[in-house]
Every structure is written in structure tokens, then in C-alpha cells.
């Protein structure tokens, strides 16, 4: 039976992930954390995996030109290099290597997540790790990590919640999301960092109040 999680609570946790253990709610639930180059992840009691990304992305250009330093290798997110994951799925190479650092850490620590929550770069990793572990996940402000489109195994377990005014969610342009994508139209567009979790929490409230978004995932 799949673990079920409140979408609003998941958004709160995603925002809190940028504060780490200084956030009281995370500190109480904290089991372990990873902070290695450009890769961060938090493993919480209840076997919840939390993956922050970029809460301060201001625009399309800054995100598209971002360079990740992973294991001494540099990956530019605007590159279209791909690589097959262990499942045989073809992913964006930079996103895949980011997710693999988290996977290797989980394996070393013998942690197995029951639910995965990620934002931004962490939302790309969420999609990949949902495919790996076969557990539900919510990806906020999700870029596109997958080369091809269409359903694959476990894709029904992944929910991508994207604001329709967040250009990061359309990157890289020739790639695709995994799972169900909920494009949320905000009552009012934000000038500046509409990519941040603060603005995602607001649009989730609006969408749920209007009956456009379920309260839980899986719904």
C-alpha cells in the first residue's frame, strides 16, 4: 500500500528544507542529512526523503545556465546530454548524476524512502527517484528530466506541481516530465521569484480552495 501525504504539508516541508535543522519542525523529525557539493538531501523520521534545490532562482536564464559540480565533474543544465539510468530510462545527464549522489547516500546508510518531496533541482531528482524506488513523490517547480514522453513504470506515483508562470518548469525545452503534471494558474502572477516555495504554497492554497487540486497525494 502506498504512503499518502498532504500536498499542503509537503509544500511546507519543501520550503522548510532550505533552513535545514534550524527549522523547528524539521529538527524534530530529522534523521540524517546529505550536503555534498551541489547536492543536498534530508531523511526524516517516517522515511520521508526531502530534496531542496534552488529557492532563489530569479529567472529563466540563471537556471538554464546553472552549472552543477558533482563528483568533480561539471554539468550545465542547458546541455542536452543524456544517460540511461539503472532502469533503462533515458534522463538528462546532469539531473541523473544529481539523483545518483542521493541514491548512493541512501544505499550506504541503508535508508529506503516511503515518500519523496523535492523542489526545483530537487524536483528533477524526485521524478528520477520515484522511478527508482517505486514510492510516491511530489515534485514542486519541476524541471523536465526525461528524454522521451509517455507513461513508464511508477510514473503514476509522481505528481509534479508547477506554476504556469514559472519558466523553469519548461526546462530543458526538449525534455519531458515524469508522472502527472498539475499546472497551477496563480490568481496573480509574481514579479520576480515566482519559482520559490513561498509562492508555490500560495498557489496551492488557491488551487485547493477552488477545488482544482486534491488535498493528498496519491489522491
Model-derived features: positions:
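N-terminal low-complexity, Ser/Thr- and acidic-residue-enriched intrinsically disordered segments
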Residues: 1-32
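Intrinsic-disorder-associated interaction segments
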Residues: 2-6, 88, 95, 193
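Sequence-level motif detector for i,i+2 pairs with an aromatic at +2
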Residues: 8, 46, 155-156
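A conserved cap/lid and substrate-binding interface adjacent to the catalytic center
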Residues: 20-117, 143, 150-152
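Serine hydrolase/lipase
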Residues: 104, 108-113, 131-219
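Gly/Ala-rich beta-loop-alpha elbow adjacent to hydrolase catalytic centers
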Residues: 117-122, 126
Amino acid at each position: 500500500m502506498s504512503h499518502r501525504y498532504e500536498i499542503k504539508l509537503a509544500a511546507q516541508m519543501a520550503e522548510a528544507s532550505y533552513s535545514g535543522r534550524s527549522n523547528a519542525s524539521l529538527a524534530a523529525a530529522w534523521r540524517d542529512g546529505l550536503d555534498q557539493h551541489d547536492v543536498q538531501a534530508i531523511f526524516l523520521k517516517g522515511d520521508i526523503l526531502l530534496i531542496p534545490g534552488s529557492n532563489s532562482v530569479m529567472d529563466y536564464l540563471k537556471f538554464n545556465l546553472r552549472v552543477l559540480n558533482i563528483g568533480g565533474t561539471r554539468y550545465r543544465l542547458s546541455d542536452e546530454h543524456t544517460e540511461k539510468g539503472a532502469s533503462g530510462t533515458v534522463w538528462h545527464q546532469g539531473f541523473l548524476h544529481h539523483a545518483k549522489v542521493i541514491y548512493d547516500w541512501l544505499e550506504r546508510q541503508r535508508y529506503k524512502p516511503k515518500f519523496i518531496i523535492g523542489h526545483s533541482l530537487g524536483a528533477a531528482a524526485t521524478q528520477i527517484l520515484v522511478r527508482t524506488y517505486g514510492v510516491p513523490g511530489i515534485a514542486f517547480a519541476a524541471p523536465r528530466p526525461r528524454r522521451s514522453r509517455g507513461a513508464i513504470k511508477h510514473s503514476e506515483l509522481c505528481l509534479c506541481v508547477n506554476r504556469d508562470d514559472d519558466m523553469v518548469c519548461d526546462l530543458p525545452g526538449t525534455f519531458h516530465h515524469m508522472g502527472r503534471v498539475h499546472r497551477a494558474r496563480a490568481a496573480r502572477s509574481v514579479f520576480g521569484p515566482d519559482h520559490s516555495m513561498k509562492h508555490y504554497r500560495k498557489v496551492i492554497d488557491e488551487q485547493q480552495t477552488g477545488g482544482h487540486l486534491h488535498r493528498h497525494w496519491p489522491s
